[in-house]
């Protein structure tokens, strides 16, 4: 009879060890991702025009030959994780291993329309990622956010006081907006009949510009912190307004909240939604709040999608925010005085929620 410990077979214990080690060293995944972005490897392969060998990559990077083996190790590991494809190519009667871009690494090609490299650079900067070393201290602080514990101030105050990281953050949000905009191009129903819209927390206007291009007769106001919009110039149907969404929101037929409410507590979200309700038109279907957020559904979503949503929920908890289930969204809408809502799928893990006053 096989021995057991705590009622578990050795094979089960070793599986547990493998899982434990996988997560102990999971930070290396993020650092290898940062490595390929910092070295512009996706751009190098893209510009190469075909799969690249390690020797070619080492030559372009101009790293010491003594590190060629390490480059190969990291490339092999990132290929295993889906960031590159390992292929065999024929060169001068010799077959060599080479690396090609995948759908994931194509999103890291700087200068392309859809590029998430700024998101990698912002999130994996020690300013943000280093804060997670304070999780234990944070969990015992009644009111402070994780970033409040780590940075010494509220995250939004920190951005105001640190222009360099503020730019990195805005660039990251703009890059993420491009992904959402890809989905919005095929999701016209939410904006039909709307003549004016306020993009609350709209940053530098990346999403608003796509909306204006798609609906040229729609007037769009980008509403954000004064320091974000103070030097930005509008167009005929796009304008910028600085202010505080907790005080008031500019009037329009509709209000857009894209990845805003997950930053805030339920009480803060109610306050934001109440101000948005005051701002939108009372004219039938035209007046509404359009929310782009995650909706957690552990029973229906695929395992990987659920994992992404739950990971983001932990991430947002560090701002005292959260990702929400449909029941949690519904509760917020009712408490903020809205009469109805509709949820439509938008991307793999985001939904478009229309909320009616």
Curated annotation (Swiss-Prot):
Active site positions: 262
Statement: the UniProt record of this protein carries the keyword Nucleotide-binding: no
EC number: 2.1.1.150
Residues annotated for S-adenosyl-L-methionine binding in this entry: 200-203, 224-225, 244-245, 258
Taxonomy, superkingdom: Eukaryota
Reactions catalysed according to its record: a 7-hydroxyisoflavone + S-adenosyl-L-methionine = a 7-methoxyisoflavone + S-adenosyl-L-homocysteine + H(+)
SUPFAM superfamilies for this protein: S-adenosyl-L-methionine-dependent methyltransferases (SSF53335), Winged helix' DNA-binding domain (SSF46785)
Enzyme kind, highest EC tier: transferase
Statement: the UniProt record of this protein carries the keyword Methyltransferase: yes
Known role: 7-O-methyltransferase involved in the biosynthesis of isoformononetin. Can use daidzein as substrate, but not medicarpin or 2,7,4'-trihydroxyisoflavanone.
Protein name: Isoflavone 7-O-methyltransferase
Organism: Glycyrrhiza echinata (Licorice)
Lineage: Eukaryota, Viridiplantae, Streptophyta, Embryophyta, Tracheophyta
